[in-house]
Amino acid sequence: MEGDRVAGRPVLSSLPVLLLLPLLMLRAAALHPDELFPHGESWGDQLLQEGDDESSAVVKLANPLHFYEARFSNLYVGTNGIISTQDFPRETQYVDYDFPTDFPAIAPFLADIDTSHGRGRVLYREDTSPAVLGLAARYVRAGFPRSARFTPTHAFLATWEQVGAYEEVKRGALPSGELNTFQAVLASDGSDSYALFLYPANGLQFLGTRPKESYNVQLQLPARVGFCRGEADDLKSEGPYFSLTSTEQSVKNLYQLSNLGIPGVWAFHIGSTSPLDNVRPAAVGDLSAAHSSVPLGRSFSHATALESDYNEDNLDYYDVNEEEAEYLPGEPEEALNGHSSIDVSFQSKVDTKPLEESSTLDPHTKEGTSLGEVGGPDLKGQVEPWDERETRSPAPPEVDRDSLAPSWETPPPYPENGSIQPYPDGGPVPSEMDVPPAHPEEEIVLRSYPASGHTTPLSRGTYEVGLEDNIGSNTEVFTYNAANKETCEHNHRQCSRHAFCTDYATGFCCHCQSKFYGNGKHCLPEGAPHRVNGKVSGHLHVGHTPVHFTDVDLHAYIVGNDGRAYTAISHIPQPAAQALLPLTPIGGLFGWLFALEKPGSENGFSLAGAAFTHDMEVTFYPGEETVRITQTAEGLDPENYLSIKTNIQGQVPYVSANFTAHISPYKELYHYSDSTVTSTSSRDYSLTFGAINQTWSYRIHQNITYQVCRHAPRHPSFPTTQQLNVDRVFALYNDEERVLRFAVTNQIGPVKEDSDPTPGNPCYDGSHMCDTTARCHPGTGVDYTCECASGYQGDGRNCVDENECATGFHRCGPNSVCINLPGSYRCECRSGYEFADDRHTCILITPPANPCEDGSHTCAPAGQARCVHHGGSTFSCACLPGYAGDGHQCTDVDECSENRCHPAATCYNTPGSFSCRCQPGYYGDGFQCIPDSTSSLTPCEQQQRHAQAQYAYPGARFHIPQCDEQGNFLPLQCHGSTGFCWCVDPDGHEVPGTQTPPGSTPPHCGPSPEPTQRPPTICERWRENLLEHYGGTPRDDQYVPQCDDLGHFIPLQCHGKSDFCWCVDKDGREVQGTRSQPGTTPACIPTVAPPMVRPTPRPDVTPPSVGTFLLYTQGQQIGYLPLNGTRLQKDAAKTLLSLHGSIIVGIDYDCRERMVYWTDVAGRTISRAGLELGAEPETIVNSGLISPEGLAIDHIRRTMYWTDSVLDKIESALLDGSERKVLFYTDLVNPRAIAVDPIRGNLYWTDWNREAPKIETSSLDGENRRILINTDIGLPNGLTFDPFSKLLCWADAGTKKLECTLPDGTGRRVIQNNLKYPFSIVSYADHFYHTDWRRDGVVSVNKHSGQFTDEYLPEQRSHLYGITAVYPYCPTGRK
């Protein structure tokens, strides 16, 4: 083999095509980290400061660069994988949002990156060294052959080396070991600027980051890669942008694929002194070296796998109508001329020759002509025909193995005897995808496939793979190593259920079964009709008038056996619909997709299946308006309907109302190249209205890209060009229905002249008489037969759906349901079951393992520690009170060493607890001991002394009798632990029917009051009737209504002396969802205000002092409790506001206008008052309320939110009560507490439904509602959000716990687990403050230790409800 030599390495000039393919396959290995551009301090790099959101100082470029149409000299480099021409805003304004940004951006990997604590580094520099400029030039020339003379004069490099993603700090959690390395290079020659993005092998270990303010811990944003010009000058429209990634798979493709032939390397043309509408990616796969003066149109290469939002198509290069092109014969060898080699290595001695002098730097042809200039230096004015065959398989670039990786092995020698022949009959040259790629790690498995005529015997461990028979007589083989590769055994579920899976040398492929067609992953029955559903969005200028529409419906119906396609688009605005009448290609896509196939041809669905992107650009003449239409197919739904999304952007000519469009039958040529189909044509259309007949035209460029299975051999007879014949073209807009309709009839087959007289079989031209659900089988001449499609039955001319579910001809297994569909059926598993691997058998869903339940956790024994399950296999351990340690190892705390008992008592330490007992001669509870008296004691005092002695034992809940000064029983007795009260006679025995539950008004005991004229109430009459029925003395398990002194029903009712309790309204009716289980008392709120027995104070505000203080509600008043730091200033507490006849429950504060807001369940109102002297209350909501309880104020949006536990609603309104809105009215039983995070826009609330308590969240407009917490909670009364720690915390009167979690529900932990009966809670500094119904006061808890630090018990002994903290300033959300 002859070849030129440069720097001691051979440079291939002209090789037979099959010798070139193995070299390309050897280069398929990903970019090695050593092949990045040189970087580090030794190369002059500057180092960006460590941190989460750092930005470099401005970099003043010695030579300006062009970005889009602008020229700039300043650059900034950011931590988060981004470069900009201006300083960055705070990361919260862009890092968690999709492209485009509102500032100029060059983003090789935009994500939330954090280099704190030495987790990687970011380096950057401007460079003019020949080594860097030479490598940049070689990359650019390889990707942009028309820029073969590009010689950069300066470059800018930025490298992110071993950087990590931002992670929330969690106790005991180690940082992730996933680190990324990538590089961006900007190169310019003063006129044009190019960007290179490099991603080495194993360089992207994380593909995205989680938003800091995520609602859901599972949410992860894929990294954004691309370019953005920034907002336009008027700040009302976004500038052009180019996005390369949108999914996790597209990010993964960054290092697996390439747009210039080297996996992990990407090149883009980003700026020029000439007009550049948008960034243009490299597309080396689009090149055709033979007759390269007429480059092919847009042909997506690997870059399409990244799901680009803007697809570069080089439409400017189309200067010829494909329908008029003359196809000349050409030799396959011509395709090899002109491809370059790329040397990506850096030698120890840098070649300092000018770039023009090194023959390895320019991609020249054998004759010395640069690629893209064959036939003349200027392509714009020259149009020459090219070989039709080259549209099928453009020749790959010629690559020298040594120049790619000098340290790797060279390929084995190949015979030079010329035995390798071109394709027979002058067929197309195979591309690099026509033979299996050589991956050294992959295992080769050959199985029969209809397109291949032989198999090769296999040996264990390594397999030999011969070239296909049609390549020629060469018997050269390649040896592969048997290693991991994807096979049917583990991946057959990726195939359609109407397909079979076949293993090949490098992987597996799916193929549709007989009587079905498609690409194997999506298969449809032959001859059956098909349906399409989708959405259409558009941003158009009709003439000069902007028209916008979003997600309007698209429906299409296709008659598969004659190629008819009907499309309807609903509710497009009339000006746009009228202007879109000529654009039949919108519905024409379905014509190509399901066209009637002539022999040897395939329609679009047979190739692309149900996942592809159709991109077309239409230019109207003579006005040259341009519109871009992108249609994305997103698979088949359960009914086998194709789902498609359409986006229309650009300008279209105005079409007057009442004009109709007429388009004659036409033909289109479609060119097939690997995973891309292209077509270019011109089309005339007429607009008529009465006698007016106008003729216009447009030119259309189409690109259809899809994924092919590269493992199966390509069928050699598949045509590279097919002709689509379109007849009966119909377009109509119905103004009354607002529906735009298209109809076309399509046939696809070989390219034929119009004069071809050969008659067609009715099966091929659609003139047969078969049923629309039947397949047409051609016979001899014009004979044919009809056969009903799969899933239908009949004689072929009349077919009806076969109900497989009714006849039993289905494969749905036990525990599944068969659902009949037109021509098919679907299996669905019953609740609690899921599909097995065969997708027919339903198996029982195995619940995920819970280490805390199955005993696989590593926590200390149950009596010492608590295991907390966090989902999946994760858990945490926490020592119980009385023990210390990390939860895995817990040791008993010796409380006796802390001297907690009275000096006259003895301390007894027990595991996890302790007790105190008074010494002989003293009596008391051990914490307080009093010398014993020798005087005689009354029965009450004796029982009291005995109970106090028993109370010293741990866990004791004895009642301690209350005696008066003479030692007699007080008529009213109350249990100090449970809160129950009752009347006793002089001997201390309980008076039947007088017991009242905690939280209610105690009974009136003692002498009967003077007779009054008040008649007995419903409650009193019902109580008397039941007592009479029970014989005057009810048993402990019999219910007796509890009434207060005025005869009203006490809000809390209990069944006898049991703990089965529930809430009632003022009429005694049970409140739904409040019935409790033993051990938990529901938190019932009265709805009738108690009578005022003292003079009523003025309802105005007693102004508080300056500083932070607490406001709490207590029946008819709002109390004021100042803070000294975090300590309660109990001596300065006072009443802020008194409101006779009210029951004030919810309370919150507006820090901007210094106003307090509250809810009143007695008055059924929401009111407010200022905190200045003498301010009077103002009612702002007084209708549509029954029991308004929780209240939250958004001081930023000037909005309030409240809950109503009777109407079961959550509502919002502005702070003046206007613009009232119901956010939620379903799936609520007892909504109570509510909290708002104004800075991040989140709303949280509790629902203490006894059957299913929960904490929920949503956005402030009511969107994205979801359950945050619904396990291990009982009666979540109180809720608070701390804007400083970003923690959501709640107090639970059922579990007796105070707990906190992150806003997304993660990081849940218990602060205190021994609360009494909390109602409301607020967070301030390092403390929580909550109201408690057992203590009837305010209790403070330290956030960090969980210890009770103080309590305040108001003079008035009644329940406290809501509580809030009043700051002297408004909290902010800055980090």
Curated annotation (Swiss-Prot):
Signal peptide from the UniProt entry: 1-30
* Record field: compositional bias (Basic and acidic residues): 386-403
GO molecular-function annotation terms? calcium ion binding; collagen binding; extracellular matrix structural constituent
Specify the Thyroglobulin type-1 domain's residue ranges.
937-1005, 1016-1084
Write out the PTM section of this UniProt entry.
Highly N-glycosylated. Highly O-glycosylated. Contains chondroitin sulfate which is attached at Ser-452 and at either Ser-358 or Ser-359.
Q: Which residues carry this modification: Omega-N-methylarginine?
A: R1308
Q: Where is it expressed, tissue-wise? A: Detected in placenta (at protein level). Heart and bone. Less in pancreas, kidney and skeletal muscle.
Q: Which GO terms describe its biological process?
A: basement membrane organization; cell adhesion; cell-matrix adhesion
InterPro entries from the UniProt entry: 6-blade_b-propeller_TolB-like, cEGF, Cueball_EGF_LRP_Nidogen, EGF-like_Ca-bd_dom, EGF-like_dom, EGF-type_Asp/Asn_hydroxyl_site, EGF_Ca-bd_CS, EGF_dom
Question: What is this protein for, i.e. what is its function?
Answer: Cell adhesion glycoprotein which is widely distributed in basement membranes. Binds to collagens I and IV, to perlecan and to laminin 1. Does not bind fibulins. It probably has a role in cell-extracellular matrix interactions.
Q: Which protein is depicted?
A: Nidogen-2
